[in-house]
A protein has these predicted regions:
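A generic fold-level signal
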Residues: 13-14, 27, 73, 130
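N-terminal charged/capping segments associated with class I S-adenosyl-L-methionine
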Residues: 1, 40-41, 48-51, 58, ...
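Flexible, glycine- and charge-enriched loops at secondary-structure boundaries
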Residues: 21, 49-57, 86, 152-159
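Canonical Radical SAM [4Fe-4S] cluster-binding loop centered on the CxxxCxxC motif
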Residues: 18-56
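Short acidic donor-binding/metal-coordinating loop in glycosyltransferase active sites
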Residues: 82-83
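Short secondary-structure boundary micro-motifs
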Residues: 3-10, 52-54, 62, 110
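Radical SAM/AdoMet-radical enzyme domain recognition
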Residues: 60, 64-79, 88-187
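N-terminal [4Fe-4S]-dependent radical SAM core
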Residues: 1-22
Length: 187
């Protein structure tokens, strides 16, 4: 068997291994026109996939243990993406943090999460601050650019909800950055 702990620290294992986790699969509360996950999410729903669309507790534990064990560097980054990762409850991420501590074995664990920001609440922001998450907010520029493609499931604009989420992050002192999709309308 391959034991990476006994391997010399050179390529290909000398660099950190990064993986994006999709705890809610393609589930999302928005219906962005350019998003390829929306179609996949609708397909899964039509097939009655239900709970198979989300990361199970069993798979979360297995992945966490194996991901940390595979690291040859002291720092491990868990990068939570979607769909919309806030479609999972805070209790899911509390369990993830417990598992990270359980399997850390001296590694420094960091967490970042990419969200559309519309589901942020005081409770989420307090959780992120307490646990030192870096939050990425998906926002495509000013209101008129953002709302062109980033629409709610009902077809309405989402910019004001994203800005409300950003204000909550600031209120709670949560570190955040922005990610924009450059497209034909905002370029």
């Amino acid at each position: 068997t391959l034991n990476i702990n006994k391997m010399p620290a050179y390529a290909p294992f000398a660099r950190p291994l990064y993986v994006m986790l999709k705890p809610a699969s393609s589930l999302c509360n928005l219906n962005c026109e350019y998003c390829y996950y929306t179609e996949k999410s609708d397909m899964y729903r039509a097939q009655g996939a239900g709970s198979r669309m989300t990361l199970s507790d069993e798979l979360l534990e297995k992945f966490t243990r194996q991901y940390i064990e595979a690291q040859t560097q002291p720092q491990v980054l868990f990068s939570w993406h979607g769909g919309e990762p806030l479609m999972r409850p805070i209790s899911f991420y509390e369990k993830a943090l417990r598992l990270q501590r359980q399997y850390a074995r001296g590694h420094m664990i960091d967490n970042c999460l990419q969200t559309n920001g519309t589901l942020l609440t005081d409770e989420w922001c307090e959780f992120f601050r307490r646990n030192n998450f870096l939050i990425g907010i998906s926002i495509d520029g000013p209101k008129e650019f953002h709302d062109e493609y980033r629409r709610t499931r009902g077809g309405g604009p989402s910019f004001d909800k994203v800005m409300r989420g950003i204000r909550l992050l600031n209120k709670h002192g949560v570190e955040w950055n922005a990610m924009a999709v450059v497209n034909d309308f905002n370029a």
